[in-house]
Amino acid sequence: MRVLHLLLFMLVGCGAARVRRSRERDWAHHGASMFADLSVRELKAVRDYLHKLPELGLTDARSMPLTKNSILLIELHLPRKHDALKALDRGQAKPPREARVVVQFGNQAQPNVTEYVVSALPFPHSHRVKTFKRNKSIPFESRPMTFVEYNHMRRILEKITTQARTLLFETSGGFSFTNCTDRCLTFTDIAPRGLNVGERRSWVMLQKNVEGYFMHPIGFEVLVNHKDLDSEKWFVEKVWYNDQYFDSMEELVRKYEDGELVKVQLPEHDEEDLFSTYIPRGKSNSASDIHGPKFVQPQGPRYHVDGNFIEYSGWSFAYRVRSSAGLQIFDLRFNGERIAYEVGLQEAIAFYSGDTPAAMQTKFIDSGWAMGTSTFELAPGIDCPEIATFVDLYHYYDTDKPVHYKNALCIFELNTGIPLRRHFNTNNMGGYNFYGGLENNVLVLRATSTVYNYDYIWDFIFYQNGVMESKVSATGYIHATFLTPNGLNYGTKVYNHVLGNLHTHLIHYKVDFDISGRENSFESIDLKYVNFTNPWSPNDYIVQSKLHRTQHATERSAAFRFGKKMPRYFHFYNANEKNKWGHHKGYRIQLNSHAHSVLPRGVKEEKGVTWSRYPLAVTRHKDSETSSTSMYNQNDPWDPVVSFEDYIRDNENLENQDLVAWVTVGFLHVPHSEDIPNTATPGNSVGFFLRPFNFFDEDPSLASKSTVIVRQDKAGNPVVQRWTPARVGHCVSDQPFSYNGTYALV
């Protein structure tokens, strides 16, 4: 009975801690909902409203014809910043909630894509066309691939592979695309889809459909022209087999049968060969019957979540996961003072090199694959600690109903295992004057995107000293192609007949600073050597570094190019606000990146990613410049709907203005044998820090009660001074691991 009473006491104590709420701020709760993703109810209301409009002639997105008008995407349309700030800062009425809707008009003489803004939610009654800079229209060929188009692609591949069934069977060691059981072939399609504006033709490569099929190319690639909306008119333009090009399937098959080409025959498939799987193998010196360390919250979480609003250790912000791109935060404040209006992911690209046509064509622009919707379930204890708060997400993309993604975002507090601050002050006599330290606990907001082969882990990390870190970690499978004699110029052999292709990852972020208000300025700070006579030894001289500040008054001067010397500090500040010591209140951006440009300026495809020219560019805020890219740039990079270069071309003044920093981070990845079965996160994480630079009068983490100070009394005994309970609670979860992994229509 004593044990039962003890368990009940522990459960009650832990439960009470979990429901403990931090103090609420009316302004924050008033405004957070403006940035919340659309609810299932709102998504369905927008869909139903548009489907009832006879002039649009909408049909189901999943109906098989390509000649149809259908909804591709529904997501939140953000309010104008000025209107949002009136609600946040003045307590005025919130602007109406609106939806951004992408409609594909395939059932008309001149097919196109049109975007609408639908208002007001949850009871929509009006809509307007959403326009882009230069009134740029959206070509139909630039639309993303859909479930239906992939079904048609599979059908033409069935015809193609039936023609070459013997070739493929003999080449792959007993695999086929049709009439197969456990030895089937699958395919990967490549983008951009063509070489010029208006094209829609894709290189497709075949792989063995086994676990980790990305690592199993068979040496067959085909160029399919699928521009026509009648899939019966799709056709093969080119075929590549074992480093040889052919103009048609008929030519390939004839030359194969006549022995007029160089054949390749992969070894018989070994079911026991686990190289592309996660199944453990090899020798481990770690005990397999003992679990590793686990996280615990002795008195429950110390952060507060209310819908899409989060508070933690002085921080407060709202968040959303944009279906078209991914994680964003809004109204970022510390102790109630705004630092940024928006910090959000814009784009992720991976540009490859290779010797096969698919490899040399691969320039993935991930918003074109609806990167934000690839938010699948997170595994407790692996993707996030078991103690995390898990949040479900809902997306409406290439569907006829909202799709529910269970546990797709997580929030947790983490001890980093390294002090935030510490000092041991020795007395040089075998003792000490004092020891002081503060544990480094942070809040992590995390989501992932699995864009086909790659998995991106997106983190926003909030420190107690007013620092925010934005980090992306890359994992998942490498994009592999068939190894050719010339292939090692473009990567590394990672298995028999398999080349891991070199590629560059670049990630783009938007940081809309509002440092103590909207009127901000930007300067860079570097060092210059100075040489002067030593004032206390006139026959000698002093050489040392001196601060050198450069005020960037225009957008062009604040656009820093890759390949140029970079200043050490990027400082954003409010010239009208000072801290206690007379310094302008500011924050700086510190890059953690190994990025470089992916293509020379002037290359056709580079036009679609002009933001990739700059590790940092600063512009004036405009509501018309909400994002640096678009989901259409993937399939039409040659004349993109959104070109970031347009944002800085007008070269506007930046002094005492509402400033937006556009940050590019990334790294080169030359695959290596340790990328098998897939890429690990260590060394593959990049990002940036937002660090206070005279924003506070002192380190704000001094407010933390987790500080520990130890001094010696006169007898030499340690005297511990702390402001938290000396004993930690016992709320340790004993729940077994569970994982569902499914997502479903709702």
Functional labels for PLM-detected ranges:
Residues 17-196, 201-467, 473, 477-486, ...:
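Extended effector regions of multi-domain proteins
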Residues 2-17:
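Cleavable N-terminal signal peptides of Sec/SRP-targeted secreted and luminal proteins
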